[in-house]
Curated annotation (Swiss-Prot):
<dbReference type="InterPro" id="IPR006935">
    <property type="entry name" value="Helicase/UvrB_N"/>
</dbReference>
<comment type="similarity">
    <text>Belongs to the helicase family. RAD25/XPB subfamily.</text>
</comment>
<dbReference type="GO" id="GO:0005524">
    <property type="term" value="F:ATP binding"/>
</dbReference>
<dbReference type="GO" id="GO:0097550">
    <property type="term" value="C:transcription preinitiation complex"/>
</dbReference>
<comment type="function">
    <text>ATP-dependent 3'-5' DNA helicase/translocase; binds dsDNA rather than ssDNA, unzipping it in a translocase rather than classical helicase activity. Component of the general transcription factor IIH (TFIIH) core complex, involved in spliced leader RNA (SL RNA) gene transcription by RNA polymerase II. TFIIH has an essential role in transcription initiation. When the pre-initiation complex (PIC) has been established, TFIIH is required for promoter opening and promoter escape. The ATPase activity of XPB is required for promoter opening and promoter escape.</text>
</comment>
<dbReference type="GO" id="GO:0005654">
    <property type="term" value="C:nucleoplasm"/>
</dbReference>
<dbReference type="InterPro" id="IPR027417">
    <property type="entry name" value="P-loop_NTPase"/>
</dbReference>
<dbReference type="GO" id="GO:0005634">
    <property type="term" value="C:nucleus"/>
</dbReference>
<keyword id="KW-0413">Isomerase</keyword>
<dbReference type="GO" id="GO:0005737">
    <property type="term" value="C:cytoplasm"/>
</dbReference>
<feature type="domain" description="Helicase C-terminal">
    <location>
        <begin position="627"/>
        <end position="781"/>
    </location>
</feature>
<dbReference type="Pfam" id="PF04851">
    <property type="entry name" value="ResIII"/>
</dbReference>
<dbReference type="InterPro" id="IPR014001">
    <property type="entry name" value="Helicase_ATP-bd"/>
</dbReference>
<feature type="binding site">
    <location>
        <begin position="407"/>
        <end position="414"/>
    </location>
    <ligand>
        <name>ATP</name>
    </ligand>
</feature>
<dbReference type="GO" id="GO:0016887">
    <property type="term" value="F:ATP hydrolysis activity"/>
</dbReference>
<dbReference type="GO" id="GO:0006367">
    <property type="term" value="P:transcription initiation at RNA polymerase II promoter"/>
</dbReference>
<dbReference type="InterPro" id="IPR032438">
    <property type="entry name" value="ERCC3_RAD25_C"/>
</dbReference>
Length: 938
């Protein structure tokens, strides 16, 4: 690693030491830029706080990792990578197999059964091979310990304190490469190490100390029952080992704390004995123990453990060789109880006003309440390595750490959240962003756990169930403002909703899962953290990004970031699909460019940032975007097998505009939940449709594993989060086929507009994750489309045609194996308006049909003209329905279709009339929306 100013770290992925640093980078550093060959990280106070909260890395370990793996000016590191790899394997094997007693320090002595101290067999030779000096030191120290067998443990602990070197020093071959840390980084580590650590601990309530009354055994039995009830009750306590510091904090937090009546005196701070079960009596194993043995000096790790072990053994057996459990380490702490429901307020005030980061953890092993026996993963579940790593961070030390887990879209965040719930095995409540996400979580809980359908309940508009062992609902359902209507006047549905929400707020919950946690920063969503009585909260997100710079509030609202996966690493491992990203630049036709420039008037100070309605409409309804989308749809429709395409458009008018011209179904904010579910199911499982248009409702919590192509027409300004979320819709790996080797992400931008700069900003975060964008011109896409026989759709006035037997007039054209006669423009406009409105048909009178050419069959019939149009439900664009030319005559029924059928028609070349019509329609839509105050996006 290369250490830069301000805690910046640059990593070369090709260096052989990179695999050994991945765990350190994930746990202790914040990713800034992770590309294919080089990554940039930063060490900040927040990342160090998250590392200490997770519990694996101490500041001494962080310091040693940087010192021993830092490149010097000659591009050399102090350790030999091969020796370090061999040492790491030995340590890992000794951790997994307790019979392999790898010494914690150089030359550790081993005590035999008869009390003699002997050098450990099998380790001396390996030690001498790694360091000749170590072997000599070992022999001398063995003699020293053997000389005083009765004080072997005390001598051993003294020797360790004198030799404070971590195991990683055995792999050092280039001592000249060891460099001191920069002053700013050393100061940062020292502040984190020496700062007063304040914790918020969920633990049993304080037991009242009472004298035993003279009243007899019955009263004593009642007191014992009350005492057991008090022990099972949990509460949050603000704890600190420094009494003065604690009293200072309490003086600023009395609004959220509960005083204790002790010996007739009300006290805000009480002392207690912290037995430290979670830190001292629980044996470390696995990853944490391996890392501590490698990078922590024996004086701070092994020495304490050996000394405490000697005290324990001597206390149990008297001769120092027993295996019983003796005295435990204790210490005095000072605590103050937090009011119910005010824990978040305490953390927020500590962080914002007092600059104190309070760690929060939940000892779910000691808590026997809210237990759900069936909440465990099914036998057929096999978690992926990164999911296991994230859950290890969550349950480090057999305690549930509150925080955020960041995994890419399509990487299995839902299953990871289910794994967290199965770890604590407590009643769980899940908060989702929308109804589709609620139903998805319900299906996944039933699929991956042993829970029955009755145990997993939901509360949405169309399906309301009382809370079960696992309860799933939306943020908006829980915090919605409801009118104060008398209970007698409420409907049955309103009463049921009130009953469910009251039950949610009254019942305690073991785990609160926040899906898409970056949305929980909104003011209303923060109310969820106060309304739900949870013991531990975990946030899940794919993009921990917000453009309002409030993402840092997650540190005190939810907790530190426990784990963040590398997108490129998951792609290389095959867990995510490989994605080809392209930016297609589309020029503006002259008429559209004129309107865009006119909207940049001096009278509107915001116009140059592209915030006017006209500017948004011009760049969204750009005809070149429409034609490029048509060309891309045709290209991916002809692949083997055909690709499923998602088209994203944020503007309301744009969604309907593209849906009408491309004949593709769309889904926006007005689409009902039932229609959304049916449309998505039809899109995933039907071969008749390969594309769908989505508004902003499809950005998050939308599971469409079949999709492999995204075409983005417009977006929410320069939102990096939206860009990443939309790309995440196609990250699910697909079965290999002839053409399906990767996924495709296209973003269409209008040249010479604000979209160029916004697009570059939107792509910045994905570029930092290793994705690259190819810049293409629309001419290249359209030339390929036209060369393969494609025909661009018309943006001019709607053209409707009816079928005829032959070329009975000059305007008849041959297409689709027959002849077609055009309707008049007035008739076409009426048919188009009815068709767009979803009406099943319309009548055309003689006045409307004035300029429409008649077929030969209607000549000299002498009847009043009234044509009846009936639109088709499912056959477009092959046929759009039928028209009955004469009422009651089934022989005069003709098919109708829409679109430019004339071969010579081309809006791209010489279609000025069509472009002018498109501009006029755009102006009408902008004026209508401005008058009705319709928002730009939905």
């Amino acid at each position: 690693m290369i250490l830069g100013p301000g805690g910046r770290i640059f990593i070369n992925h090709g260096h052989p030491a990179y695999p050994h640093l991945m765990d350190f980078l994930t746990a202790c550093c914040e990713p800034v830029c992770r590309t294919l060959y080089v990554s940039e990280y930063t060490i900040s106070p927040s990342s160090l706080s998250a590392a200490t909260a997770e519990g694996t890395y101490s500041m001494e370990m962080v310091r040693n990792v940087i010192r021993y793996f830092r490149l010097d000016e000659q591009q050399q590191i102090p350790v030999d990578v091969e020796r370090y790899a061999a040492l790491e394997r030995r340590v890992r094997d000794s951790v997994q197999d307790t019979s392999l007693d790898l010494p914690m320090e150089v030359g550790e002595a081993k005590v035999s059964a008869n009390g003699d101290v002997k050098a450990e067999e099998g380790c001396e030779e390996a030690t001498d091979e790694l360091s000749p000096l170590a072997g000599q030191v070992k022999k001398e120290e063995t003699k020293e310990v053997a000389a005083e067998p009765r004080r072997r443990f005390l001598s051993l602990s003294k020797r360790i304190s004198a030799k404070s070197e971590p195991l990683v020093t055995r792999a050092v071959v280039n001592t000249g490469a060891l460099q001191p840390l920069p002053a700013d980084l050393e100061q940062m580590l020292r502040e984190e190490e020496n700062s007063s650590r304040v914790r918020i601990v969920l633990q049993p309530c304080l037991r009242p100390v009472k004298r035993r009354a003279v009243g007899g055994d019955k009263q004593h039995s009642d007191e014992q029952q009350c005492q057991r009830a008090e022990e099972t009750k949990l509460a949050y306590f603000l704890t600190s080992p420094d009494r003065n510091h604690m009293e200072h904090l309490v003086s600023r937090l009395q609004d959220f704390l509960v005083p204790v009546l002790l010996h007739g005196t009300r006290r805000w701070v009480v002392s207690d004995v912290d037995r430290g079960v979670e830190e001292r009596s629980t044996a470390e194993s696995g990853r944490a123990k391996t890392l501590r043995r490698l990078f922590e000096a024996p004086s701070s790790a092994s020495g304490r453990s050996v000394a405490s072990k000697s005290l324990t053994n001597e206390g149990a057996n008297g001769d120092g060789l027993g295996g019983g459990v003796g005295r435990r380490c204790t210490r005095i702490v000072y605590k103050s109880q937090v009011m119910d429901g005010k824990m978040r307020n305490v953390r927020e005030r500590l962080y914002k006003e007092l600059s104190v980061r309070a760690d929060l953890f939940y000892d779910y092993v000691q808590d026997h309440s809210l237990h759900v026996c069936d909440l465990e993963l099914s036998e057929n579940v096999r978690l992926r390595p990164y999911q296991v790593a994230s859950l290890e961070r969550f349950r480090s030390g057999n305690k549930a750490h509150q925080g955020v887990i960041v995994l890419p879209c399509g990487a299995g965040k839902t299953l990871t959240g289910i794994g967290a719930a199965a770890t604590v095995k407590k009643r769980t409540i899940v908060m989702c962003i929308n109804v589709m996400s609620v139903l998805q979580w319900q299906r996944e809980f039933i699929r991956w756990t042993n829970l029955s359908e009755d145990q997993v309940t939901v509360c949405i508009a169309d399906k309301k169930q009382m809370p079960g062992d696992v309860f799933i609902t939306t943020y908006s359902m829980l915090i919605a403002r409801r009118s104060n209507v008398p209970e007698m006047e409420q409907s049955a549905d309103a009463k049921l909703t009130a009953k469910i929400l009251a039950s949610v707020g009254e019942q305690p919950w073991g785990l609160l899962l926040l899906d898409e946690v970056h949305t929980a920063l909104a003011h209303n969503f923060q109310e969820v953290l106060n309304k739900v009585k949870y013991k531990c909260v975990i946030g899940l997100s794919a993009t921990l990004l917000r453009e309002d710079d409030k993402i840092g509030d997650l540190r005190h609202l939810v907790g530190p970031k426990l784990y963040e996966a590398n997108w490129l690493d998951l792609t290389r491992a095959g867990f995510l699909a490989r994605v080809e990203c392209a930016e297609i630049q589309c020029p503006l036709p002259k008429a559209f460019l004129t309107e865009y420039l006119e909207s940049q008037s001096d009278g509107d100070p915001f116009a140059r940032r592209g915030t006017t309605r006209m500017a948004h409409s011009v760049v969204c309804l750009n005809p070149y975007k429409l034609w490029c989308t048509q060309a891309l749809l045709e290209f991916h429709r002809n692949r083997s097998p055909p690709d499923k395409v998602i088209i994203f458009c944020d503007q309301i008018d744009g969604i309907q505009y593209y849906a009408q011209h491309l004949h593709v179904p769309f889904m926006d904010g007005k689409t009902s939940d039932m229609e959304r579910e049916n449309l998505l199911q039809y899109f995933q499982h039907s071969d008749n449709i390969n594309a769908i248009i989505l508004s902003r409702v499809g950005d998050v919590a939308l599971d469409i594993p079949c999709a492999s192509v995204v075409i983005q027409i417009s977006g929410l300004g320069a939102s990096r989060r939206q860009e990443a979320q939309r790309l995440g819709r196609i990250l699910r790996p697909k079965p290999a086929s002839l053409d399906n080797v990767c996924s495709y992400f296209y973003t269409l931008v209008s040249q010479d507009t604000h979209e160029i700069s916004q697009s570059y900003e939107r792509q910045s975060w994905l570029r930092d994750q290793g994705f690259s964008y190819r810049v293409l011109q629309s001419d290249m896409v359209l030339q390929h489309f036209l060369r393969t026989g494609g025909k661009l759709c018309c943006v001019g006035p709607p053209r409707w045609w009816y079928e005829c037997a032959g070329p009975s007039c000059d305007s008849a054209v041959a297409a689709k194996g027959t002849y077609w006669i055009p309707f008049s423009q007035e008739a076409a406009l009426r048919m188009q308006s009815r068709f767009v409105a979803g009406v099943r048909g319309c009548d055309l009178t003689a006045t409307v049909l004035r300029d429409t050419p008649r077929p030969p069959e209607l000549k000299n019939m002498g009847v009043e003209e009234k044509w009846t149009v009936c639109f088709s439900d499912s056959c477009a664009p092959e046929t759009f329905g039928t028209v009955q030319l004469v009422e009651g005559n089934p022989l005069l029924v003709r098919r109708i279709c829409c679109g430019p059928l004339a071969v010579e028609h081309d809006c791209l070349h010489g279609g000025e009339e069509c472009l002018q019509y498109a501009v006029q329609q755009m102006k009408v839509m902008v004026a209508k929306n401005s008058k009705n105050r319709i928002p730009l996006t939905t």
